[in-house]
Amino acid sequence: MIDFVKSRDTVIQKSFFEEFNSQNREMGSFAYSGNSESVWTGENITSIWKTILINETGSYCVAARPMTMDGAEFNLDLMGYSVSEDQINNDEIGIWNYISVAEMGGVLLFLSYWIWTCLHFSKIIFPAQKVICLYIFLFALNQTLQECIEEYVFSSECIKYRQFYSVYEIIDFLRTNFYRLFVIYCALGFGITRTVPKYLMIKGISIVIALCSVYWISLYKDVYVVSEIFDMIQYEVFPAIWVYSICHLLKQCTSVTTYENASKARFFRRMLNAFIFIFCASPMLHYLSNIIFGNFDYRLSVIIGDLFTFMEKIAFPCYIMFPTHNEALAYNRNVAEEAQEKMI
């Protein structure tokens, strides 16, 4: 972990990898001036571009030492660097801040529209479609915490940065596993064509909460092994869940033969097509994000990456579960019920 020391005058963007390999590096004990302060703590700085502040002399200091939540007792290695960068226009920084606010407003507007749609089609709504509201809320909360992290990452509020970052990691892990549970239940038809048993709902929620608790402990105590296990779950188990869900939906579509279940078959077929598209498109979106991140401005790359994330995590699931798709299913259900009443 690295602590950075800075003053407040000029804003620049630098590659820390380049700076640590700079020929202008000086080692020694540098004075901690009154207008300098600790501003950032993070991991793997050699691969991250950040915005930092330098003083009028064109130099800044970096104090590096290992850190954990329990504290550390190590000697500080202080390094000074000479830099010469043009000052970024404050108006340009303000524009990027407005764009971030617009992104958050778009997510909240989408959440409001989804809630209104669920209320408008309340008679034909599925339980799974109500759960989408909770998922969008977690996504919006996650984006809000991300904005708070960016707000404090280069301010004097290092403690608040660490607090926001820890909460952000937990909410992101909760949202991801909640999404996985939702995918499995939808593929099995729970909350769509059949009710969700209480014991099954309690078990699913308990598993997600237990995983989040262990993940939080691993973050708090910096347990590397646990983090590696959860990374394996993130990148290995989730594709297996998608493959299982696709196979089960394919079985559902091929097993429906009667006229009464024709609308149900169309619903599952739409889910199957969307699941296959998401499963195939996700790696491509991540690949494009990496290309854009390496060839465009950092802020622009973040915006495009957020757009891809919105398409993958929000737009596609909401398309599958959009309430207007239930009209044919509800109509055929009413026709079947009326026919059954006439027979009685």
UniProtKB/Swiss-Prot annotation:
<feature type="transmembrane region" description="Helical">
    <location>
        <begin position="223"/>
        <end position="243"/>
    </location>
</feature>
<feature type="topological domain" description="Lumenal">
    <location>
        <begin position="193"/>
        <end position="198"/>
    </location>
</feature>
<keyword id="KW-0256">Endoplasmic reticulum</keyword>
<feature type="transmembrane region" description="Helical">
    <location>
        <begin position="99"/>
        <end position="119"/>
    </location>
</feature>
<feature type="transmembrane region" description="Helical">
    <location>
        <begin position="121"/>
        <end position="141"/>
    </location>
</feature>
<keyword id="KW-1133">Transmembrane helix</keyword>
<feature type="topological domain" description="Cytoplasmic">
    <location>
        <begin position="142"/>
        <end position="169"/>
    </location>
</feature>
<keyword id="KW-0472">Membrane</keyword>
<feature type="topological domain" description="Lumenal">
    <location>
        <position position="120"/>
    </location>
</feature>
<feature type="transmembrane region" description="Helical">
    <location>
        <begin position="274"/>
        <end position="294"/>
    </location>
</feature>
<dbReference type="Pfam" id="PF09437">
    <property type="entry name" value="Pombe_5TM"/>
</dbReference>
<feature type="transmembrane region" description="Helical">
    <location>
        <begin position="199"/>
        <end position="219"/>
    </location>
</feature>
<feature type="topological domain" description="Lumenal">
    <location>
        <begin position="244"/>
        <end position="273"/>
    </location>
</feature>
<protein>
    <recommendedName>
        <fullName>Uncharacterized membrane protein C750.05c</fullName>
    </recommendedName>
</protein>
<feature type="topological domain" description="Cytoplasmic">
    <location>
        <begin position="220"/>
        <end position="222"/>
    </location>
</feature>
<feature type="topological domain" description="Cytoplasmic">
    <location>
        <begin position="1"/>
        <end position="98"/>
    </location>
</feature>
<dbReference type="GO" id="GO:0005789">
    <property type="term" value="C:endoplasmic reticulum membrane"/>
</dbReference>
<feature type="topological domain" description="Cytoplasmic">
    <location>
        <begin position="295"/>
        <end position="344"/>
    </location>
</feature>
<dbReference type="InterPro" id="IPR018291">
    <property type="entry name" value="5TM-prot_SCHPO"/>
</dbReference>
<keyword id="KW-0812">Transmembrane</keyword>
<feature type="transmembrane region" description="Helical">
    <location>
        <begin position="170"/>
        <end position="192"/>
    </location>
</feature>
